[in-house]
Curated annotation (Swiss-Prot):
Belongs to the bacterial ribosomal protein bL32 family. It comes from Shewanella frigidimarina (strain NCIMB 400). Residues 1-34 are annotated as: Disordered. Keywords: Ribonucleoprotein, Ribosomal protein. Residues 21-31 have a biased composition (Polar residues). This is Large ribosomal subunit protein bL32.
Length: 56
């Protein structure tokens, strides 16, 4: 089992954790239906970049 050589300070611990935060999902509004969807993904209606790509 690994054991640290020296104790890390609160400052160093915080600096390491500063990159761990999660970012919110990037949402886009579809041009045809006005629906929110994830970037670079097909909407629930089957539209992608203003064109129907999936027939339901």
């Amino acid at each position: 089992m690994a054991v640290q050589q020296n104790k890390k300070s609160r400052s160093k611990r915080g600096m390491r954790r500063s990159h761990d935060s999660l970012s919110t999902a990037q949402l886009s509004v579809d041009a045809t239906s006005g629906e929110l969807h994830l970037r670079h993904n097909v909407t629930a209606d089957g539209f992608y970049r203003g064109k129907k790509v999936i027939n339901k």
